[in-house]
């Protein structure tokens, strides 16, 4: 045992001072004291000071707080203080692991990394970590996505189903083995690929041709359909929508059938509804065979919803629809418990005052009610102050990397019970790749050096074997099913009102002579044919090169 000093000054059961004897001890070091009544008690150094004695000699002292001792599987605090002059020793790994709760069990562990300052492996209980909601919060560049991927690797190894909302296509790198062997050796990690356990769905097949096209169920009531509209509907417009849905009740229908049903309604208010429905139809999200909840949630499998390149309202539409369908299925006990990760959560459940998203309501519901049905939420954001405070406060496990913004720190403090100024100071001083772990999974907030990934930390483009400025071209065969086609459907009902030409402010363009018009039309057609030939030729040439 390494003696580091003795207790000095006033002592309480929870706090005391240590007069150091020159041993190498730093802030955050774990120490132990042998209590007369309770045996070895674990404590932690919270501050170190240097000063001069009256005799002019240097004095090094430290402040420490008591963590406790383990009795009958429960961590307890001593009821009586230590004695002045009691000896203080460096804590051993066995005591630290036992008291804080880092011991590895046979099943259901998550290996996060090592305990800062002593290198002890940090294993946390799966049930206590993810089954009561998780938040991963950090400033940009602090290692947030890297940390999330470490968690995902552990969940896949434990056969936990995962659904990932991925606005920037950050998570396909889970398919590629890590080749940073030195870093992996430091954490006893082996390279791995989870390609066989991952399915990508995309809202934009042209930018991610290897993914499956995301198709959603077209089953809504009036309120649900109103929620996903790009703008708010008036009561008259809702009534038109209600009547149209009533016409289609009991039959299979498409978005275009719904548009036709609205056309049969009377009054000018229907044209706004038609315009909004056409904007939803243009997304292509309701074309083709829809994915089911059972497609998304499978044991030991991760479904990545790639939203990259889609407009914000389309992203929110997707999250709203998927979250509602998954939550409804969980309430009916149709799916196994799963991990629902929301990246860029501040865009999908913003705090009031930072805007409103159509997905906010369902995510608040999942945060407050989801855990009892087995739907375990993970909120990921680099702007904690902009995330709904009620959602954040429902996360029982917080993994906090470096944050320096005062507003973000305030939001974090409000979401954590027992948050102290010392914890705030620790968060601001974290290095890249370090995280403060707080929650039921540990008896005391701890600083963790996040382990090396088993998979490679690279962009999705690099994961496909291309450089970032040479995106992969889709083959013509793969592209053909996703080419946008004009939807032909029978136009029924009255035509939309035409503008009064007499009221047009701008004068009409002079009509070209007939012969000039014919020539211009001919040149335009030739240009279109030439351009079409070049585009098709580009894909055919690419396919021929691939065959060679």
Residue map of PLM features:
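Conserved ATP-driven motor cores of ASCE-family P-loop NTPases powering translocation/secretion/packaging/pilus
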Residues: 365-369, 373-451
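Basic- and hydrophobic-enriched, low-structure N-terminal and domain-boundary segments
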Residues: 1-137, 146-153, 158, 333-336, ...
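Conserved nucleotide-binding/hydrolysis micro-motifs of P-loop NTPases
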Residues: 50, 68-71, 131, 168-172, ...
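P-loop NTPase motor domains
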Residues: 154, 169, 173, 179, ...
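Glycine-rich phosphate-binding loop of nucleotide-binding enzymes
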Residues: 107-199, 437, 469
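Hydrophobic residues in beta-strands of the RecA-like P-loop NTPase core, especially within AAA+ ATPase
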Residues: 165, 342, 380-381
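Conserved P-loop NTPase motor module
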Residues: 433-548
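Alpha-helical scaffold elements adjacent to nucleotide-binding pockets in ATP/GTP-utilizing enzyme cores
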Residues: 150-151, 170, 224-225, 240-243, ...
């Amino acid at each position: 045992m390494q003696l580091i000093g003795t207790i000095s000054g006033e002592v309480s059961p929870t706090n005391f001072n240590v007069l150091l004897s020159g041993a190498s001890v730093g802030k955050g070091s774990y120490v132990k004291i042998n209590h007369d009544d309770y045996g070895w008690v674990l404590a932690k150094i919270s501050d170190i000071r240097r000063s001069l004695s009256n005799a002019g000699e240097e004095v090094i002292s430290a402040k420490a707080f008591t963590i406790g001792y383990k009795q009958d599987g429960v961590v307890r605090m001593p009821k009586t203080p230590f004695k002045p002059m009691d000896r203080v020793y460096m804590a051993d790994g066995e005591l630290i692991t036992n008291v804080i709760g880092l011991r590895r069990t046979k099943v259901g562990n998550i290996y996060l990394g090592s305990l800062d300052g002593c290198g002890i492996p940090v294993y946390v209980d799966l049930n206590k970590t993810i089954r009561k909601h998780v938040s991963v919060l950090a400033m940009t560049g602090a290692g947030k996505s890297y940390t999330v991927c470490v968690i995902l690797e552990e969940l896949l190894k434990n056969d936990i189903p995962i659904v990932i909302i991925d606005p920037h296509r950050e998570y396909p790198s889970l398919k590629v083995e890590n080749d940073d062997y030195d870093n992996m050796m430091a954490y006893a990690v082996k390279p791995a690929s989870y390609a066989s356990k991952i399915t990508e769905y995309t809202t934009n097949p042209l930018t991610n041709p290897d993914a499956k096209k995301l198709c959603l169920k077209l089953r809504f009531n009036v309120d649900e359909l109103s929620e996903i509209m790009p703008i708010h509907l008036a009561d008259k417009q809702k009534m038109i929508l209600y009547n149209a849905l009533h016409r289609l009740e009991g039959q299979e229908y498409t978005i275009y059938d719904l548009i036709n049903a609205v056309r049969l309604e009377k009054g000018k208010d229907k044209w706004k509804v038609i315009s909004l429905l056409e904007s939803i139809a243009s997304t292509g999200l309701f074309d083709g065979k829809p994915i089911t909840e059972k497609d998304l949630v499978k044991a030991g499998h991760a479904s990545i919803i790639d939203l990259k390149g889609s407009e914000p309202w389309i992203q929110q539409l997707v999250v709203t629809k998927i979250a509602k369908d998954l939550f409804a299925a969980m309430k009916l006990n149709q799916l196994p418990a799963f991990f629902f990760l929301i990246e860029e959560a501040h865009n999908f459940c913003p705090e009031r005052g930072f805007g409103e998203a159509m997905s906010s309501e369902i995510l608040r519901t999942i945060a407050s009610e989801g855990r009892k049905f087995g739907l375990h939420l993970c909120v990921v954001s680099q702007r904690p102050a902009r995330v709904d405070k009620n959602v954040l406060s429902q996360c029982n496990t917080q993994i906090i990397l470096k944050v320096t913004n005062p507003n973000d720190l305030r939001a974090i403090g409000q979401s954590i019970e027992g948050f102290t100024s010392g914890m705030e100071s620790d968060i601001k001083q974290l290095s890249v790749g370090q995280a403060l772990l707080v929650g039921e999974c540990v008896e005391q907030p701890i600083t963790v050096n996040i382990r090396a990934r088993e998979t490679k930390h690279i962009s999705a483009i690099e994961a496909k074997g291309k450089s970032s400025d040479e995106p992969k071209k889709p083959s013509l065969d793969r592209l053909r099913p996703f080419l946008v086609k004009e939807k032909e459907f029978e136009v029924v009902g009255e035509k939309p009102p035409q503008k009064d030409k007499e009221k047009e402010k701008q004068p009409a363009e002079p009509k070209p002579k007939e012969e000039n018009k014919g020539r211009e039309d001919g040149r335009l057609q030739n240009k279109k044919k030439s351009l079409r030939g070049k585009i098709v030729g580009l894909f055919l040439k690419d396919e021929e090169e691939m065959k060679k």
